[in-house]
Amino acid sequence: MHVPKDRVVYGGDILYSGRLPAVIDGGNVSSWIKTFDALKQFGDVTFVPGHGKPAKLSAFEFSTREYLVLLHDHMAKAVEQGVDQLAAMSSLDQSRFSKLANYPELAGRNASFAYLEAEAASFE
């Protein structure tokens, strides 16, 4: 929700700071990335995330967009090359995000959902 007079955009669970995003069953990593990119249209405003402190959009780039792009690109390439899910998950290097809260709980699950999404997209 954009509140122009306050120069604020409420981003909710599209934006994460300091913690790993939770990719959930039925979610869509590709659409999430596009939605994040669409937030750039609001320019120099303050964004209120679902998790973390309000900040400029650039503050959410690493823990949200960069992470989701890594998941999406790695899994899409793996599916395209015929790599099975376990091998794709094993070869995914998420270590640069390991200091984010929830990493131990979510990294594997997120990779699994991202692979399944990429696999489903390959049939479209």
Residue map of PLM features:
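Divalent-metal (often Zn2+) His-rich catalytic cores of metallo-beta-lactamase-fold enzymes
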Residues: 8, 30-83, 87, 91
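Aromatic side chains
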Residues: 10, 16, 67, 97, ...
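C-terminal regulatory/interaction regions
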Residues: 80-124
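Catalytic core of the metallo-beta-lactamase
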Residues: 1-34
